[in-house]
Amino acid sequence: MTSPVAQCASVPDSGLLCLVMLARYHGLAADPEQLRHEFAEQAFCSETIQLAARRVGLKVRRHRPAPARLPRAPLPAIALDRQGGYFVLARFEPGADQAVLIQRPGQAPARLGQAEFEALWAGELLLCACAASPTQALARFDFSWFIPALVKHRHLIGEVLLISLVLQFIALLTPLFFQVVMDKVLVNNAMETLNVIAVGFLAAILFEALLTGIRTYLFAHTSSKLDVELGARLYAHLLRLPLAYFQARRVGDSVARVRELEHIRAFLTGNAVTVLLDVVFSVVFIAVMFFYSVKLTLVVLAALPCYFLLSLVLTPVLRRRLDVKFNRGAENQAFLVETVSGIDTVKSLAVEPQWQRNWDRQLAGYVAAGLSVANVAMLANTGVTLISRLVALGVLWVGATEVVAQRMTVGELVAFNMLSGHVTQPVIRLAQLWNDFQQTGVSMQRLGDILNCRTEVAGDKAQLPALRGSIELDRVSFRYRPDAADALRNVSLRIAPGEVVGVVGRSGSGKSTLTRLIQRMFVADRGRVLIDGHDIGIVDSASLRRQLGVVLQESTLFNRSVRDNIALTRPGASMHEVVAAARLAGAHEFICQLPEGYDTMLGENGVGLSGGQRQRIGIARALIHRPRVLILDEATSALDYESEHIIQRNMRDICDGRTVIIIAHRLSAVRCADRIVVMEGGEVAECGSHETLLAAGGLYARLQALQAGEAG
């Protein structure tokens, strides 16, 4: 009989399957293929399970309880066995034998005795619970976004607030000490009382320093968690935005918006929020000040409407100027990115002086915008300082009259003046931080432009099953912008599984648009795109794209090794599979000639490789995960004739068992296709085999004659 340990270890990727089981137990949709695609090609470990659990709406926490405490653990949970596999710990059944109910992926539930379970279990549990509602991710991003985040960390926030309250009460002791010293010690020459007060004052100082350090640590810890959460959400959201979002914006503008995260981070991790807490807790000091003197307290409080009026007048001006500063900064960022990206063109055209003049002009505009912001901030700070000085003068004058009239003692006046400082100083510091606060508001608005855009990934969309390769376009029309002409107009096309279809036509005829709709990079304005009978408009786009292989006209390579670039969609691919894909793409020979072969690190976008070499690596990358549908969008246009000949020679093997769409300007690239579709003006002009289209004497025949003439 097979032991429980062996049975559990033999289940492939038991961690992933256990997570899916628990997600479905909690009523959450979880697709194992989608999770494997997003998080790991190899077996899930505990850390990967925790990450994937967030994706499906679960919170998972690692726990190592003592065996005696296991019956009190929240179940069901995922348990780790001694062989590194996972199983579901369902429940402990009451009784003398303390039976344990477990379930291994793909098997029926099993009852184990306590000793048998302890022999199986490695001591680690992954406790699972439903996370916040998935609809929470769709909430608008503004300052209210931090409310659920603060609720999530409410225990830490509560500790910070409690410490802040204690610090305010400690701060109350300092004025009282001074009052006692001036009214009792100095008048009566009570040195023993002075020594007692000094010891008490020293203890208060040390305790205050300790609590301040603890508060700073707790606040920095909480702020860092919020910072990580916001940064992770921003990047994940950016990756899930549709292609149309990026095409409608310059790269530099998007980068500038992402960089606004730095302002929010600085605000969260700086002293701004502690100042806000001090302002809130100043109500304690105001209450004590009323106890000392109502008249003096009213003098101090009379300044608060002045601060408010100053803010009311200057805030709109400051906000407008901050908007101008951001826009100028975004223009600079976009221009810089554009310059660096196109530096070869700038140098080849020798337009550096013109670019330098443009940069100087834009930089001057940005500096001027920054100076205008600084001027408004300086005016606000000057106004606040003036008001605070007038308040100090009023307190001194009114307080002196109260002392002369013997309605206050000198010690009480000094204590009141110190208490009023605890009210006015946070307000003054808040005014000095007002520029940062407004900058943070602008940053939130700019980041909201990204985070409030709807993504193309929706958790409630159906997962596409394994493809057979049937593609149908049913009266499809599409335009890139509402005010633009149709890029595709009433296109209907059927492609059978395993069929090789070539798509040709003049530039701008809609060839690439056709394949982008099949990839669901864009959604058709009218009509439907169906794959294996499934309308791709209502399926999860990732479940579609991971079954497609796409090679664009220019393949983007990343700053990693050749092997990693080829195995990008299958990080767990073996070296044999990588080499097989490279051979099929005609890339193996030149890769072997690189300094470190497949381990050679490539520069950004494959710098150092020729266009043809980059393209062949791109083709190998598209083939590595054995897609059922392969799209070659001008994939051989950058190849020399020898490289193209290698690809054409391997085309039969490349196309074997899959549906292939070949877009090409060179008609020789589609001659092997089962069927050729000729596009013209966004419509299907002709369709048929190479010989049929030549015999028809239409657009395809004219294009063939033109290319034959050029070749001649």
Curated annotation (Swiss-Prot):
Residue ranges occupied by any ABC transmembrane type-1 domain in the UniProt entry:
157-439
Q: Does the keyword Transmembrane helix apply?
A: yes
User: Where would I find the ABC transporter domain in this sequence?
Assistant: 471-706
InterPro entries (UniProt xref)? AAA+_ATPase, ABC1_TM_dom, ABC1_TM_sf, ABC_transporter-like_ATP-bd, ABC_transporter-like_CS, ATPase_T1SS_HlyB, P-loop_NTPase, Peptidase_C39
Major location (coarse): membrane
GO:BP terms for this protein?
Answer: killing of cells of another organism; protein secretion by the type I secretion system; proteolysis
Q: Supply the EC number(s).
A: 3.4.22.-, 7.6.2.-
Residues that hold ATP according to the record = 505-512
Transmembrane region(s): 160-180, 194-214, 272-292, 298-318, 367-387, 390-410
- Where is this chain's protein located in or outside the cell? Cell membrane
Q: Tell whether Protease is among the UniProt keywords.
A: yes
Q: Which GO terms describe its molecular function?
A: ABC-type transporter activity; ATP binding; ATP hydrolysis activity; ATPase-coupled lipid transmembrane transporter activity; cysteine-type peptidase activity
Membrane topology designation: Multi-pass membrane protein
Q: Which UniProt keywords apply?
A: ATP-binding, Cell membrane, Cytolysis, Hemolysis, Hydrolase, Membrane, Nucleotide-binding, Protease, Thiol protease, Translocase, Transmembrane, Transmembrane helix, Transport
Specify the Peptidase C39 domain's residue ranges: 7-128
Give a GO cellular-component term: plasma membrane
Query: What is stated as this protein's family in its record?
Result: Belongs to the ABC transporter superfamily. Cyclolysin exporter (TC 3.A.1.109.2) family.
Role this protein plays:
Involved in the export of calmodulin-sensitive adenylate cyclase-hemolysin (cyclolysin).
Q: Know the name of this protein?
A: Cyclolysin secretion/processing ATP-binding protein CyaB
Organism of origin is Bordetella pertussis (strain Tohama I / ATCC BAA-589 / NCTC 13251)
Q: Which gene encodes it?
A: cyaB
